[in-house]
A protein has these predicted regions:
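Secretory targeting and sorting signals
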Residues: 1-56
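Histidine/cysteine-enriched polar flanking segments
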Residues: 57-662
Length: 662
């Protein structure tokens, strides 16, 4: 179902910036292993599994699923139903939402559940259908009516390799009940036809374990003769939202409440305005509200309890899964994908992940929305989490909006993230899961030159008036330096570099425009960032056709980070002035970007004016948000508007993911 409003809160229920249901059985959806994938990866990515041996259409009952993807079950679905290709083949949802809010978020006496136990719940975790909404999440399958003799019986079962990932329900005696491999359908049922429903219990995590396909096999026994018919289904992939989708609810951190309080059942209203407790928080919220109003988005800010963690973007990504519905529609469930960020210093085997991301289970999991996590437990306790763990934060993941290029069609875009082939990369089991979906083929760019390692430090996307419908907003340190050189040429080199901020709240009090151009860390930072951004753009051009016509460059100023002796990473930079590229597209023609605090000319910030001019031809306007104290000047590397927000976006205008042609 489309859920255009987030689930109401249950009544019972860092980013390292400094360098009535009974307890459910485990559901196999938390951890992955590192293994050679071989042919299984190819199967998951291409959707090409070998079909069973061809056989004549058996007389009598047939099993039918939505092979032609029109949301209906008709004879048109029967051709080629035993195979599955990207163009044709039936689909099923991973039924991971919690339609009756029966998933526990705490143990006995309010004890905190371990991360894996907290995630091990959803509608598919047991064989109970939770009302009409849960029923709607089942893929429709039918056994056609046929005139069989009185003694005829039949079974329907998933193939053994997929059986633990698939559950079949049958309508019997007026209700949908689980149908096991040994359960027999009667002659009377076969004469009338049998309505079935199928759910997957999970997404594809590791193709070496399960590539997402199931063969449903109907065996009919009549007078000692057994006939067989079958249909193949694939689980719908996890689809990341993209920045052209309009924001439904803008999320930002509530520092007055933490996840443990939600888990203990403290009542919580995410629309109630919390008391600002962080420096600059009130100003940040004020400007964020103004920007949303300007974008025509009047819904209240959606407050997310973090207990003090400001980096909301690094906690999870918003996604969805869908299957065809009648009338060309999609039937969807929302998915919150928890960050695989194993926290240095605090991670334990029971609580390995970022604590603030746990609030998603109590606050966001519910009707039409599930929460998943995927990480390598072997990273707990490793020194690598201290130096490289931030690459796994979800602020390091984005989505190229939809595009077509050289015969490739990506109707829901492509995942893009920062990483290398080495340690400066996200959790391997997490990126393997993304690749295993077979859609939105992930693309990695090197972000090892950034102190925090996140792609959102220099890249975002906004709607635009061109054939793709969007442009990339990219940080340009060369442009930032040229703007400062122009000020020096005008005789203004002695003016302060940072405008509107008390000197004591800057990294280098008293630094002038001319001094910034001479400062070695800024000169070196500009060069490191320029090379890193140019390399990223080359990758995007080669692999996604992102030529200059689809790039808007905004000024930036990067500084090299002074690293301690023995630190294993070298030549790292951070944004010295707030990064205009680190903003949020509302999807409605407004871009929320951090105030620049650069020098001014004729009363206008020179960096802000340059950014506005750069975007002027796109149809997207900038709304400036004050984030210096709240985000930019925090820790060693800081962050900006995108880093400290998250968004639930509207899905009503999406194009079907299954029309992708990679």
């Amino acid at each position: 179902m489309d859920h255009d409003t987030p689930p109401a809160p249950s009544p019972t229920v860092p980013r390292d910036r400094t360098i009535g249901r009974a307890p459910r059985r485990p559901s196999r959806r938390t951890r992955g292993r590192t293994a050679a994938l071989g042919a299984a990866v190819l199967a998951a990515v291409t959707g090409a599994l070998p079909a069973p041996s061809a056989h004549a259409t058996p007389p009598g009952p047939l099993i039918r699923a939505d092979t032609d993807r029109d949301g209906l079950l008709t004879p048109d679905d029967d051709a080629g139903k035993a195979a599955w290709t990207r163009e044709r083949g039936a689909l099923m949802l991973p039924n991971i939402d919690d339609d009756q809010r029966r998933c526990p978020v705490a143990g006995p006496a309010g004890a905190r559940l371990p991360d894996d136990r907290l995630a091990d719940c959803g509608d598919a975790a047991d064989p109970v259908l939770d009302g009409t909404a849960d029923l709607a999440d089942l893929a429709p399958v039918r056994i056609t009516a046929a005139p069989v003799a009185a003694g005829a019986t039949a079974t329907v079962a998933a193939d053994p390799a997929s059986r633990e990932y698939v559950r079949i329900f049958a309508r019997r005696h007026g209700r949908m009940v689980p149908l096991g491999p040994g359960d027999r359908l009667t002659a009377g049922e076969l004469r009338h036809g049998v309505r079935l429903g199928v759910e997957a219990t999970d997404f594809v995590r590791d193709p070496a374990k399960w590539a997402g396909f199931t063969d449903l096999v109907l065996r009919v026994d009549r007078d000692g003769v057994t006939t067989e018919d079958r249909v193949r289904l694939r689980v719908a992939p996890l689809v990341f939202q993209h920045d052209l989708m309009p924001i439904r609810r803008m999320m930002t951190a509530d520092h007055t409440t933490g996840p443990a309080e939600l888990e203990r059942g403290t009542p919580y209203d995410p629309a109630a305005r919390p008391r600002p407790v962080k420096p600059g928080e009130a100003e940040f919220r004020r400007d964020l509200r103004r920007g949303l109003d300007r974008a025509g988005l009047p819904a209240p800010l959606f407050n997310y309890p973090t207990g003090g963690d400001v980096w909301t973007q690094d906690l999870f990504k918003t996604a969805y899964a869908s299957i065809p519905a009648p009338g060309g529609r999609e039937h969807r469930i929302g998915v919150i994908v928890r960050s695989a960020d194993v926290m240095p210093g605090t991670a334990t085997p029971d609580f390995p992940l970022r604590d603030a991301s746990r609030s998603a289970f109590a606050l966001l999991r519910g009707p039409g929305t599930g929460v998943i996590q995927q990480y390598d437990p072997g990273r707990v306790g490793s020194d690598d989490s201290l130096y490289y763990g931030s690459f796994s934060s979800t602020g390091n993941f984005g989505t190229l909006p939809p595009y077509t290029w050289r015969g490739h069609r990506y109707p829901v875009g492509r995942i893009v993230y920062g990483g290398t082939a080495g340690k400066e990369s996200p959790d391997v089991s997490f990126t393997r899961m993304l690749a295993a979906q077979g859609y939105q083929r992930p693309l990695a760019v090197d972000t090892s030159w950034l102190g925090v390692g996140h792609i959102d430090e220099f890249l975002s996307f906004v709607p635009a008036r061109n054939d793709r419908g969007w442009v990339a907003v990219v940080a340009d340190p060369g442009l930032g330096r040229r703007l400062l050189e122009e000020l020096v040429a005008q005789g203004r080199g002695d003016e302060p570099l940072v405008h509107g901020i008390a000197p004591g709240d800057t990294e280098d009090p008293g630094l002038t425009v001319a001094g910034a151009l001479r400062k070695p860390s800024l000169t070196r930072g500009t060069e490191i960032a320029r090379k890193g951004i140019d390399a990223a753009l080359r990758t995007l051009k080669e692999q996604a056709g992102l030529t200059d016509r689809y790039v808007v460059r905004v000024p930036a100023l990067f500084g090299e980070i002074d690293l301690p002796a023995g630190y294993p990473r070298r030549d790292l930079v951070a944004n010295y002035l707030p990064a205009a590229a680190n903003g949020v597209s509302t999807g409605t023609g407004v871009y929320l970007a951090p105030r620049q605090h650069a020098p001014r000319t004729a009363g206008r910030d020179v960096f802000e004016r340059a950014a506005e001019r750069a975007l002027s031809g796109t149809g997207t306007r900038i709304s400036w948000v004050e984030d210096w104290a709240y985000a930019h000047h925090v820790g060693t590397v800081g962050g900006e508007v995108h880093c400290v927000t998250n968004a639930l976006r509207g899905l009503s205008g999406t194009r079907p993911w299954w029309t992708e042609r990679d």
